[in-house]
Amino acid sequence: MPPKRRLVDDADAMEDQDLYEPPASLPKLPGKFLQYTVGGSDPHPGIGHEKDIRQNAVALLDQSRRDMFHTVTPSLVFLCLLIPGLHAAFVHGGVPRESYLSTPVTRGEQTVVKTAKFYGEKTTQRDLTELEISSIFSHCCSLLIGVVIGSSSKIKAGAEQIKKRFKTMMAALNRPSHGETATLLQMFNPHEAIDWINGQPWVGSFVLSLLTTDFESPGKEFMDQIKLVASYAQMTTYTTIKEYLAECMDATLTIPVVAYEIRDFLEVSAKLKEDHADLFPFLGAIRHPDAIKLAPRSFPNLASAAFYWSKKENPTMAGYRASTIQPGASVKETQLARYRRREISRGEDGAELSGEISAIMKMIGVTGLN
């Protein structure tokens, strides 16, 4: 119950109330804001000097040496060794040559916090062994897979499917035993380098360059595996809807708000395929701005129906964490469940559908309802 209003009997008090003035407004703010220190930066990785790539890589094969630098630095050096010309591309993209040290080193009165030299006085100039090269291949294969899929979680978890890609590559290079024995860097997981590269503004251009360059062997065999992973990577909505339209046998397809978006989806994807040709499957991996045209928000009802169907039919989607009903959708899960009880016909005569819905269904091979 709200408190009772107190009656004011005192005439002076009533007069004071009439004379009440609101407090003055706050003074205007000057518009200044906390500034970053001029010339300051967070600890960052580096790639050293181009002439030192091989010697730096040899040194960084040793864990104790890797531990001296920013955790991403060794991975970037291994990539520069793997792909000649990448060092210059990284420099063009703004990657520093100097790497921060994990712990500053004091020499006399000077404290060193970063350096572009990653090898020590005891590091010898030598060629890498085949097993060392294969170990660098393994590390970089996992790293680049994480970059094209836009996530480090599978690599951090050591997913078996990632290991299979490397084993397939080693078999193609006639070194099948290295699929099991190239383990010199197995304790150095590249997940931090994946996250760092995925956060750079040039990541899409980097992936595009990898996918469109004709590499000599063993680069060709290496990139064949990366391309297989990159194809339709980060395009889950598109691939799920395509599978739904091709394989669904229930009447959720005929819900009007879903059906009308099928037509839109087919038109948009056809236009994107025409515009991008062979690059269409890689729009997600190269972070092309057109990839957003295939996002759930473009077809919220169709995407909701497709995810609902896929979670019921596809075991690999059962653990998909995204919400079934997408933002902006008007279709409800109860409605999808009700329509799912009825089957459609593909290639056989079935019950008639309304004119406009029927025309849309014919686009995907649906001939009626059972």
From Swiss-Prot:
It comes from the Viruses. GO terms for cellular component: helical viral capsid; host cell; host cell cytoplasm; host cell nucleus; viral nucleocapsid. Gene3D superfamilies: borna disease virus nucleoprotein, domain 1 (1.10.3040.10), borna disease virus nucleoprotein, domain 2 (1.10.3050.10). One of its GO terms (biological process) is symbiont-mediated arrest of host cell cycle during G2/M transition. Transmembrane segments: none annotated. It is found in: Virion; Host nucleus; Host cytoplasm. InterPro entries: P40_nucleoprot_BD-vir (IPR009441), P40_nucleoprot_sf_BD-vir (IPR036260), P40_nucleoprot_sub1_BD-vir (IPR015969), P40_nucleoprot_sub2_BD-vir (IPR015970). Pfam families: BDV_P40 (PF06407). A motif (Nuclear export signal) lies at residues 128-141. Keywords: Capsid protein, Helical capsid protein, Host cytoplasm, Host G2/M cell cycle arrest by virus, Host nucleus, Host-virus interaction, Inhibition of host NF-kappa-B by virus, Modulation of host cell cycle by virus, Viral nucleoprotein, Viral penetration into host nucleus, Virion, Virus entry into host cell. Residues 1-25 are annotated as: Disordered. Residues 10-19 have a biased composition (Acidic residues). A motif (Nuclear localization signal) lies at residues 3-11. Its main location: virion. Isoform P38 does not have the nuclear localization signal, nonetheless it is localized in the nucleus. Encapsidates the genome, protecting it from nucleases. The encapsidated genomic RNA is termed the NC and serves as template for transcription and replication. Plays a critical role in the nucleocytoplasmic transport of viral RNP by interaction with other viral proteins. The nuclear export signal is masked by the interaction with the phosphoprotein P. Delays the host cell cycle progression by interacting with the host CDK1-cyclin B1 phase in late G2. Inhibits host NF-kappaB activation. Homomultimerizes to form the nucleocapsid. Binds to viral genomic RNA. Interacts with phosphoprotein P. Interacts with host CDK1; this interaction delays host cell cycle in late G2. Interacts with host NFKB1. This is Nucleoprotein. It comes from Borna disease virus (strain V) (BDV). The gene is N.
